[in-house]
Amino acid sequence: SGVWTGAMALTEGNAGSDLGLLKTTAVPRPDGSWTVTGSKIFISSGDHDMAENVIHLVLARIPDAPAGTKGISLFLCPKVLVNDDGSLGARNAISVGALEHKMGIHAQPTCVMNYDGCQGWMVGEPNRGLAAMFTMMNAERLFVGVQGLGVADASGQTALAYARERLQGRVPGRSGTVPIIAHADVRRTLLSMQSFIEAARAMVVHTALEMDREKFHPDAAVRQRAGENVALLTPVIKAALTDFGFEATVAGQQVLGGHGYIREWGQEQYVRDARIA
């Protein structure tokens, strides 16, 4: 419903792609909840006033946990604690340490989050936090791929509109100055962008349908086959659509020449926003 939102708290200053190095800890409380203590960085939508509560999914270590990724557990830590009747209660011991000043995606608050002995509840089994967190990863991979596709499409639409309006140069067989879309290399650039965009959109729709089949189809064999396809396609989508999406976005900027480098047309923002994906 959007009344509450969520944040995934994995990365730490010393633990990026190697999450086995994370130092955030969780110790049990008598009531069955946990006290979570540590600091995380690069937390997308870690805090904001667009929802009445933010639910943090935090990776942490419990006492006597094995070293490395095999000793990581997952905890649900709400920004605002919830009373027994479902109403919002006291503020949890979660605070923003800093806001990251980013190259792009300025509309999204990316935060350093401090968990100062906050109250949390374990999700799943002890020391199985990564497995629990990765149940969301296929959907997240698809969403990131769509991010690359969407920005490339926006850049392509702007480039096409500009190429139809911008009068520059001449071509054989036509008199007077022509729109730059009449030049072969500009058309090649626009068509290359559109080829990627249409193929990527088809790949996204196919994979999204497979995700629905994996979850909802009544036939177990169909669900299993769809799940195998999803496991294969989602990493490809995340990698390919973001890389090619950035290249297409830059190509759209190039169509505008110098105008693509200034803010008036918006292409420079698309390039900055596409880079994060």
Model-inferred region functions:
Residues 1-24, 28-29, 208-223, 227, ...:
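Internal maturation/activation junctions in enzymes
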Residues 5-9, 37-43, 53, 93-98, ...:
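Glycine- and acidic
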Residues 33, 37-91:
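A short core secondary-structure module
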Residues 33-36, 121-134, 164-180, 208, ...:
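Active-site-adjacent bridging/hinge elements
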Residues 42, 81-97, 102, 109-140, ...:
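A glycine-rich, basic-preceded beta-loop-alpha segment at the flavin cofactor/substrate interface
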Residues 141-218:
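Extended amphipathic alpha-helical segments enriched in small hydrophobics
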Residues 198-240, 253:
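C-terminal helix-coil-helix/basic helical segment that borders enzyme active sites and/or dimer interfaces
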Residues 259-277:
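Glycine-rich phosphate/cofactor-binding loops in nucleotide/flavin-utilizing enzymes
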